[in-house]
């Protein structure tokens, strides 16, 4: 998926849970990553900075291949 700043996305559970990043940290991901709308605020290489606005959470960097358009 080609992404750009301002796109509304969510994380793909299967790709995030089986990733190298998940194996290096806590694998209990909060549900808002998969269920709520996040806005791409920056992109650096293969990673996108996502801001989830509905809940008071910090922004998070995810690989762009772990994201899908929020429908």
Curated annotation (Swiss-Prot):
Topology in membrane: Peripheral membrane protein
Return one GO MF term.
quinone binding
Checking InterPro entries in the record gives: NdhO
Methyltransferase among keywords: no
Keywords (alphabetical) are: Membrane, NAD, NADP, Plastoquinone, Quinone, Thylakoid, Translocase, Transport
Q: Which reaction does it catalyse?
A: a plastoquinone + NADH + (n+1) H(+)(in) = a plastoquinol + NAD(+) + n H(+)(out); a plastoquinone + NADPH + (n+1) H(+)(in) = a plastoquinol + NADP(+) + n H(+)(out)
Keyword match NAD: yes
Q: What is its EC number?
A: 7.1.1.-
Q: Which GO terms describe its cellular component?
A: plasma membrane-derived thylakoid membrane
Entry's localization field: Cellular thylakoid membrane
Query: What EC class is this?
Result: translocase
User: Which domain of life does this protein belong to?
Assistant: Bacteria
Query: Could you say which protein family the record assigns here?
Result: Belongs to the complex I NdhO subunit family.
Spell out the HAMAP family in the cross-references: NDH1_NDH1O
According to its UniProt entry, the function of this protein is described as: NDH-1 shuttles electrons from an unknown electron donor, via FMN and iron-sulfur (Fe-S) centers, to quinones in the respiratory and/or the photosynthetic chain. The immediate electron acceptor for the enzyme in this species is believed to be plastoquinone. Couples the redox reaction to proton translocation, and thus conserves the redox energy in a proton gradient. Cyanobacterial NDH-1 also plays a role in inorganic carbon-concentration.
Q: Its quaternary structure?
A: NDH-1 can be composed of about 15 different subunits; different subcomplexes with different compositions have been identified which probably have different functions.
Protein known as: NAD(P)H-quinone oxidoreductase subunit O
Gene designation per UniProt: ndhO
